[in-house]
């Protein structure tokens, strides 16, 4: 099911998602009618922070946090901006990034020894996904909430 299929049809005509979530990823997605807002949030030059909760298999490199903080380069030469990794347990962590490249979180985790088994975006800028919000549900927020 597509995201916009979940919303009332009278709203869908003017709305579009800001960024994207992969099919196997869940979590926070901003939907707007404001193109400037969309550009601001998705532009790498804005350095908007996005935080993910990750469950993974494998053993992270001893230097995983340091490597993330310095930025990574994959085998194809793709550069990833510095990110912040917070270990929660031996199989879960939080990762905060400031860009949104294709499968970026999965690719970065792979570079430090982890294979992502579950991925959930929990924060964009100052907007935090309410824990009690069910999949497919939504809340309204103001532009002020994002820009503050």
Language-model segments: residues:
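Basic, flexible Lys/Arg- and Gly-enriched helix-loop patches that mediate nucleic-acid binding at interfaces
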Residues: 1-148
